[in-house]
Structure formats: structure tokens, C-alpha cells
Amino acid sequence: MNTTAPKLIISDIDGTFLNPHGRVTPRLRDVVGRAVRSGAQFGLATGRPHRWLLPVLDQLPFSPICVCANGAVVYEPGTDTVLRAFELTPEAMGDVIVAVEPLFADVAHGYSVERVGSSALTPEEECFLVTRDYNPDAWDSAYAVVTVEELIAVPAAKLLIRCPSMTSADMFELIAPVVDPADAHVTYSMNEGLIEFSHPGVNKATGVSVLAAHYGIEARDVVAFGDMPNDLEMLAWSGMGVAMANAASVVLDAADHVTASNAEDGVAVVLEHWF
């Protein structure tokens, strides 16, 4: 492990910064507070849209700038401002759907989009739109059901395809070879049959690099924590990429260091080495 303390700490949220109960533990909150008071910068990098950040930020004594939607949105919660957004065009989303639709002709599936919106308070049904067969999660309390044509009519931070009968890894193996990288970046952040598409070349590393530049910090002075394939580029870009013990195998293999699980305060274990 590096002996020099990082200047920027970046953590994924689900499966990493939060414990399995969705909480920031007192131990983790304390060490992050010590790091910030010592002069380090801190940020969260998540697949979540920025409107889903408040339950996490409410557990912290400060409101860090966050990288959201897998790097497509950089958001300042203190002023409720989108600092940067990388959006998929309607044309690109249409091309993606044309490419992947034949792969799922015989299984139930649906599409959704996450639009950026002007604020974290923008009504959810204006930002989260789904097709009839999408089958939203229980926590998706508000959404608009639209046609595919309406879904992709305006730019979006993310396009998603859901197939409940498959794992995300199996879907990824089918989808990745047929999607032109010039149309979209392909990844996933959960195991339950959900694939996420973003602007070409945009991933968490993109958003984190924007944040690092904002603070005048170079990649070698960044430590990043993650657990799922949508964290891979961020971990590779950072001077030190740390995987949680509960991480996907591909993430464990790619990381510079493996810490304890999110149930065992793995992020705090590493940060306490410096702070």
C-alpha cells in the first residue's frame, strides 16, 4: 500500500461505501471526516442518478461533489447544480436498441432512460422513463411509461435494458460484442439482469477525472474504491484502485489492492492507514 496519503478519495456507493443495510458506519464517517479535515478531497462515484443521493449525503457531515450515472453527470449537491453532463444522443440510443433487440426477441425485456434534469428535485417521472415491459424495481416509486420512440426522443445520461430472467454478466456477454463503441459505452452495476449504456467512452473514470481536474489533483494522487464492473475504469485510472472483498471477480483481479468487505468497513480499513 502507498505510504503517501491520497489527495483525493473516491468511493462507489452501493456495495462499497454503504454497508449491506444501506448505512454509512460511524467508523467510516469518522475516518472520512478526519481525511477531509487533514486537507484531502472526497467524492462519491456511483451508477445512481443524482436524485438518489440524498439518503447517502444525509449520513455525512458535508456534501461532496459526486460523480453520478456512471460518470455521465458531475453534480454539486451544495448548490444543487449539474457541473458537467455527458449525454447519449437519440440517434445513438436508437442504434443501440436496433443492435440488441434481436438478442432478446424470445425473452421478456424492457428499456428505460435516465434523463439529467435540471435539479435533483426534478420530478422523477420527468427523468426516469420506462417502456411497458421494463419491470421497475420497488424503489423506483415514480416513473413514466412511454413508447420506445418517446423514450429516446431526447438525450439521456443512461439507457438501460432489463431482462429479469438473465444475469447481468450473461447479458453483457451477449450485448458487448454487438454494440458499436462509437454509439455507447456498455457496463453493469448489479447482478440482476440490468445493462447500462452511456455516452461513448464515458465511464466513472471520466467523471472522476473531471472532479480531479476541478481540484487540481493528478491521477497518481487518487485512491478509488469499488466492487462492480462499472468501477473498473475508475480503479484503473486512479493511482490506487481498491476492490472490496465482496467485489465481482473481474474487479478483484483488476484492483491494485483488496480490502475487507463493505460489511466489514473495508473502505475505513484502508483510509485508517493514512488518516
Question: Each PLM stretch: what is its role?
Answer:
Residues 3-8, 25, 197-275:
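Mg2+-dependent phosphoryl-transfer enzymes with acidic/Ser/Thr/Gly-rich catalytic loops
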Residues 5-21:
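Asp-based phosphoryl-transfer active-site loop
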Residues 13, 71, 226-228:
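Active-site metal-binding loops of divalent metal-dependent hydrolases
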Residues 15, 35, 70, 159, ...:
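Residue-level signal for inorganic ion chemistry
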Residues 23-132:
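Active-site phosphate-binding/coordination module
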Residues 28, 53-57, 171, 175, ...:
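Hydrophobic packing residues within well-ordered alpha-helices of enzyme cores
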Residues 38-43, 62-64, 158, 220-222, ...:
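Short active-site oxyanion
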Residues 103, 108-225, 229-230:
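Conserved acidic, metal-coordinating active-site core of Asp-based
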